[in-house]
């Protein structure tokens, strides 16, 4: 019999077959007190085992720890994103840019620079609001810049006639015959335009006594 056992052991070693390890009984599953876990965190030398039933690691001689069932299965916390801040950022990016005010400012600056260059310079930059004055390219020897007075707003009933335009006084036009001959007609047009824009006042009606 002994010879048979020896031959059987030799055959198992030759074939590379090993006996399966004996099943270990989980002290937590075998215990009535299932609220505790047999695990020693501070003993690295002791081997630990994982139980598939209770999903716990346990060690021989481990200390009792008060851990409820499912306590080790922690789900990763998701970061909460503030939706209000995201919506504000998107709304700011989607806002259209107002290019109209920038264009009006640029036109006003170009108009002022044309007068600051020289008193005898040719009129080359005129805003779009005064399109009928574009024929004055050949007029020279204009009045100096001191004789012009600035107007914050031309009372034409239109908001576009604002900020940075110059007005020629009536005395300046009378003293300078060149200006009278060249732009006298245009001044008449301006005055007639101003008169037409003014709303006529309603005259009171008087009822005759019968």
Curated annotation (Swiss-Prot):
| Claim: Kinase is one of the keywords in the record | no
List zinc finger spans: Dof-type.
Answer: 24-78
Say yes or no: keyword Zinc-finger present: yes
Q: Which PROSITE patterns match?
A: ZF_DOF_1 (PS01361), ZF_DOF_2 (PS50884)
- For this entry, list what GO says about its biological process: fruit development; positive regulation of DNA-templated transcription; regulation of DNA-templated transcription; regulation of secondary shoot formation
Q: Where does Zn(2+) bind?
A: 26, 29, 51, 54
Main location class: nucleus
Protein name, entry field: Dof zinc finger protein DOF4.4
């Amino acid at each position: 019999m002994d010879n048979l056992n020896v031959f059987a052991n030799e055959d198992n070693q030759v074939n590379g077959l090993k006996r399966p390890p004996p099943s270990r009984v989980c002290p937590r599953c075998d215990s009535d007190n299932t609220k505790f876990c047999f695990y020693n965190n501070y003993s690295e030398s002791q081997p630990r085992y994982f139980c598939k039933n209770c999903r716990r690691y346990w060690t021989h001689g481990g200390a009792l720890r008060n851990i409820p069932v499912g306590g080790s299965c922690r789900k990763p916390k998701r970061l909460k994103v503030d939706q209000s801040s995201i919506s504000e950022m998107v709304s700011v990016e989607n806002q259209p840019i107002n290019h109209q005010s920038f264009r009006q400012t640029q036109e006003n600056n170009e108009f002022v620079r044309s007068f600051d260059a020289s008193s005898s310079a040719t009129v080359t930059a005129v805003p779009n609001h005064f399109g009928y004055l574009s024929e004055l390219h050949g007029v020279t020897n204009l009045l100096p810049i001191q004789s012009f007075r600035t107007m914050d707003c031309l009372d034409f009933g239109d908001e576009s006639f604002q900020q940075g335009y110059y007005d020629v006084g009536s005395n300046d036009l009378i003293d300078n015959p060149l200006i009278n001959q060249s732009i006298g007609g245009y001044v008449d047009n301006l005055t007639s335009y101003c008169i037409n824009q003014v709303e006529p006042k309603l005259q009171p009606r008087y009822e005759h006594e019968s």
